[in-house]
Amino acid sequence: MPQMNDIMMIRPAKRTESVQEYYFSRKLKEIAAMNADRASRGEEPVINLGIGSPDGMPPVQAVEALCESAQQAGNHAYQSYVGLPQLRQAFADWYARWYGVELDPKTEIQPLVGSKEAILLISLAFLDKGDKVLVPDPGYPTYSSASRLVEAEILTYDLCEENGWWPDFEALEQMDLSGVKIMWTNYPNMPTGAAASEELYARLVDFGRRHGILICND
């Protein structure tokens, strides 16, 4: 039987060497240390504007509905692997109401835990070792982390204020796009707050179709 010392010596997968501690985790520690130092000198704390963490209560109706649902025995079993039909339909209705987009709740909607899970699953599904990925700069750090974990090659493209924080399509066309499988975009944009338009999405779709690139908007 393996001893504890033997287990502790097992090396993690080599791919983990390509990723570091999550960017925002590091930053929160830096801010905490900075504020502790400032507090020791009687100075005001630094206000963290880096993460949009909710600080308000959900609507009372939502809390009551959750409590009522939690008391129903049938709600504590494993759910469908593709999500409850009612939930998928609600997502489809929301997209239709807000964006005028028609989605098939059976084949075009997949409920997930959050963006990190979705980004990694998409990367695992479409990227082989050595495939290339277009990642925005500045952009959400998880795009690069997931790409490194699947051993893809990261190609960054710049987002500039003078261009409204949109991709520079002329610059993209000058890049070597051979082997690029995925282009990550993010609108409303993090961290700039820039919004997209129908024109931008139309250009992204056209760019993806012409170059055989999967456009993934987070």
Regions found by a protein language model. Give the residues of each.
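N-terminal small-domain helix-loop-helix segment of the aminotransferase-like
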Residues: 4-8, 14-114, 121
